[in-house]
Amino acid sequence: MDTKLLDILACPICKGPLKLSADKTELISKGAGLAYPIRDGIPVMLESEARTLTTEERLDK
């Protein structure tokens, strides 16, 4: 995924910023507490496809 997209993409739920996961497989929304998958380089920004962040992930800065 092109990291330049992070400058223009926002979480569709809370409208907050997104952060690329360390392994570059998800876009993380701390505001919504969700992780959106990246499949074949394309972020899938559907709430139904997102996973809920664990408590540890939510607290991780």
Swiss-Prot record:
Any single Pfam family the record assigns to this protein: Trm112p
A GO cellular-component term linked to this record: cytosol
Highest rank taxon of the organism: Bacteria
Matching InterPro entries: Trm112-like
Similarity annotation: Belongs to the UPF0434 family.
Protein name: UPF0434 protein PFL_1779
Organism (species): Pseudomonas fluorescens (strain ATCC BAA-477 / NRRL B-23932 / Pf-5)
